[in-house]
Amino acid sequence: MIGTPAVLSISSSSCRSHPLFSSGKRTLLPRAMSGETLAPAAAAAVQEQIVQDGNRVGSVKQQLSSLFEASLRATFPELNIEPMVAACTAKFGDYQCNNAMGIWSKLKGASAEFKNPKSVGQGIISNLPPSEMIESTSVAGPGFVNIGLSSTWMAQSIQNMLSNGIGTWAPLLPASRVLVDFSSPNIAKEMHVGHLRSTIIGDTLARMLEFSNAEVFRRNHVGDWGTQFGMLIQHLFETFPNWEDIGEQAIGDLQEFYKASKKRFDEDDLFKERAQEAVVRLQSGEDKYRDAWKRICEISRREFDLVYERLGVHLEVKGESFYNPYIPGVLEELSSKGLIEESEGARVIFIEGQQIPLIVVKRDGGYNYASTDLAALWYRLNVEKADWIIYVTDVGQSLHFTMFFSAAKRAGWLPDSNIKAFPKTSHVGFGLVLGSDGKRFRTRSSEVVRLVELLDEAKNRSKAELLKRLEESGKLAEWTDEELEKTAEAIGYGAVKYADLKNNRLTNYTFSFDQMLNDKGNTAVYLLYAHARICSIIRKSGKEIEDLKKTGRIVLGHADERILGLHLIRFAENVEEACTNLLPNVLCEYLYDLSDKFSRFYASCQVVGSAEETSRLLLCEATAVVMRKCFHLLGIQPVYKI
């Protein structure tokens, strides 16, 4: 058993305190959603509870799955079957249940009633609990159960969302405590474009999981420990002997300070020896070295926070130093379980299928990333009680995480193979940011692109385009300087984020300001302007939307109204898919499709001045509400006027 170390770490204000998280309220799923076997009557009761719960209904897919689960348990009580419900193309209906073929293959020759997949599908339909959400069902082909949703129910669902809030459309996820490890820059180094993907992908995953009612720990595992600090501290002492008196002026530009110390470390063997001695003295806890380390960490943290503030990202720092005191106990536990072996002077864990072992103690007796990561995982599982731990890094670290997770499974910390079992870990890998030349994105002088400079340029370009648009339309006088600044930031930073998030994270993508700031196509600019246009439609109607919510009624009478309504109510399942598969681009695709479907609706259905004005204004408002929630989940500020 690993106890809490007497000294948790050499603490610093940059690494903050070491609070133990209290166990938050868990979100309990109905048993039908958790996989526990229910009698048909109980399953039907669970379905009714989900559908009628005024606070949280889950996705349409989840609600339909509960109905079909009840039917499958009633029709085939001897089989343990999970319903396979998915959205389908319009010519077949709105959704499909695709269990029949699989069930029939299990029942071949064992049932006189179910002679073919089609009869299985008909049996499933016959035992469906009654529900207002389903208008029609039919069996097609080899047993596919086609489902048509009730337009009246769809309209009521949208109206309920407008009355009770978008939170009622949050999906139901099985994990209740999730830790997302993302961003994680190194102390004393400036954040660059390479940190962009981890920061915004991790932030979006955290936002989606929080919306889905998980308790989320946003963890910044900064590199605040290791040999580089001996180099930095020794350079500080030798260059500015009076560093304590002159304060931060001694360090100045932290990036330049790092480069200068690294140059000495690489070129001066005597300095290198002194730097290595400084590491030993720091790790032994000498006050002078600890104070210098604190000072460097504090300066770095403030610079990081300026970037996070601009990106709207919130993180809690628990750096490498926090977990350092836990490493000996964790390694002792792993050794007692027979996992750690000696190999060529190092202590290692051999992983099945891997030629190279996972090194946990180096030849010189020092710790490394693997030993720190194992200690961090132990802490996160045993102290913070996380159900799901997600690591957001580049794909180049995939092998490390494969081996690291395998070691944790061998230790019995994680389930061996069942991907649905908890606790679990996931590595969210992502590709490179490329320049126009197809190579890693760098400045003309081959330096990495500083994230601060990139954000500055995004805002400045956005502001220039906005000013040009307003001057051409004659609306510039209607805007205050503050509105211009905030809108330029929203569009500029949003464009940078969306250009990244709309891509499958595993792929590389080419960074182009011209493309991401284009107001046509699948860009943040286009989507933000689309949202602003919807807000303008509502304003120009002269109607108070809050009054309409109380007295009006949505009717999905026109084909394009129904298409838009159907896409709106699929919001929750798209968030669910994005969370489950850890793919933010799923939400981006949904948002872009929503804008497209609204455009078609607006082109074919007159809103202001029509007989259906109230209903259609409410549909406009529902679209704007869902778009705003999508923007929020993607970390993008909405724009209300253009």
Stretch-by-stretch model annotation:
Residues 1-20:
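N-terminal chloroplast transit peptides
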Residues 20-21, 26-155, 162-166, 172-642:
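Non-catalytic interaction-recognition regions
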